[in-house]
C-alpha cells in the first residue's frame, strides 16, 4: 500500500509524506539527557504541534470517508443500472450485473479503490499520530525517571 501511496500526503491535501512525518517524530521525541530541564519544557510544545497535526489529519480522514461513501454510491448505482442515462452515454456499461455480483465490480473499480486507499492511508496517519501523542504524554515521566536514575548513579 505504501508503494501505491508513496505520493506525498500533499496529494491528499496534506502537508508531508508519512515517511517525512516518521523522521520528524524521530527527531522531536529524542530526549537530550544533558539538558533534561529544557526537554521537559519542550513537551507541551511538542504536544501542541502533534495535536494540531492530528486534528488536521482527522478532519481529512473524515472527509476521505465521506468521499468514499459518495463514490461508492455513485459506482453502486452505475453497476446496478440505476444511474441517469447521461452517465451511461458518457461512460457506457452494457453488462447486466446480478445484485450478488455487484461487489465484484465495486471491489475492482479503480476510482473506488483510489478513494479507499486514500481513506486507509489517512486512517493510518491518524493512528500513528495518536500513538505519538501518547508517547509525548509519557515524555515527562521518562524525563523524571532519567533524573532519578542519574541521582541514584551519583549517590544522591
PLM-predicted stretches and their roles:
Residues 8, 12-156:
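Charge-rich amphipathic alpha-helical interaction elements
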Residues 2-7:
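Acidic, Ala/Val/Gly-enriched low-complexity intrinsically disordered segments
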Amino acid at each position: 500500500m505504501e508503494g501505491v501511496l508513496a505520493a506525498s500526503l500533499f496529494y491528499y491535501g496534506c502537508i508531508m509524506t508519512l515517511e517525512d512525518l516518521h523522521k520528524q517524530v524521530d527527531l522531536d521525541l529524542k530526549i537530550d539527557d544533558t539538558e533534561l530541564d529544557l526537554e521537559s519544557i519542550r513537551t507541551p510544545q511538542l504536544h501542541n504541534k502533534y495535536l494540531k497535526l492530528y486534528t488536521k489529519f482527522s478532519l481529512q480522514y473524515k472527509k476521505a470517508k465521506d468521499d468514499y461513501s459518495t463514490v461508492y454510491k455513485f459506482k453502486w448505482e452505475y453497476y446496478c443500472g440505476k444511474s441517469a442515462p447521461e452517465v451511461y452515454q458518457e461512460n457506457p456499461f452494457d453488462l447486466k450485473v446480478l445484485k450478488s455480483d455487484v461487489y465484484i465490480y465495486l471491489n475492482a473499480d479503480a476510482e473506488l479503490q483510489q478513494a479507499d486507499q486514500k481513506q486507509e492511508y489517512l486512517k493510518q496517519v491518524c493512528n500513528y499520530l495518536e500513538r505519538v501523542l501518547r508517547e509525548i504524554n509519557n515524555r515527562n515521566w521518562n524525563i523524571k525517571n532519567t533524573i532519578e536514575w542519574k541521582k541514584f548513579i551519583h549517590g544522591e
